């Protein structure tokens, strides 16, 4: 979907850079900024509003961005004072992607579309969040915008964790789970009405 992977990479790298600099990890921050720069240079050719994209990331480009961002998330020490806060930061920043992966896995297993790990890895379908939102909202641009807005909401929660304790981290994760639950309920009820 035009602009989705690039836009998410820019947002996720932006939140990771902000948290990295806040937690005194400038090396990770600068790596994240490099990803932002690459994405900003690529985005005008990949997302052109109602016009079709001129270039695409392809599987290689999207996989590289995802792998690099995941490596930054694993490498980082996102909080010194609480392991829960340190664990919560990447969970919130990557929250939309994690939600999509869990949702489609549960749905594919529950409906019998996949029966083994190999089938799960090989399965390609139009049941990802961006496809579901495109059907619900009526356009690809609206779907991309909605996913980016959800990523911003969860990323802002990650920024709020800077000086948070364990209780605040658990509350922010709980809030994120409730937002995801509301989205799931709305999706499910929309499907039932068709």
Where are these regions (language model features)?
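Alpha-helical transmembrane segments
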Residues: 3-194
